Amino acid sequence: MNVLSTNLQDVKIIEMAVYGDHRGFFTESYTKEKFADAGITIDFIQDNHSLSVEPGVLRGMHFQRTPKAQTKIVRAVTGVIYDVLVDMRIGSPTYGKWEGYILSEHNHRQLLVPKGFAHGFVTLTPNC
């Protein structure tokens, strides 16, 4: 597992090991111990999946205020998405700043979206 920092405070790109062969691939999407070893401790309360059949579908911006705020892990199981995050945390050094990230079935990257961030994505390919 590789955890990359970004220009937004507390946002991380997570790269899990991917094991592939002629049948496809296997990867862990979440392992509590590995995440904790990387300094990421999350108490997940919900797991969601979405499918957008057409390219160009925009989902978001999603934002929850305390006490409903959630840390999220976002990934694209199929296709390619462009995910945008905006730091909405008043007092944060990166408050009001945003960045976008490509997540795809090819790069297997996951995006750690901390509480207090708005996030949304647009599908760049069909069936995302």
Task: Place the predicted regions along the sequence by residue.
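Short beta-strand His + acidic residue motifs that chelate non-heme Fe in jelly-roll/DSBH
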Residues: 111, 119-124
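Non-catalytic, conserved peripheral segments adjacent to functional cores
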Residues: 1-109, 125-127
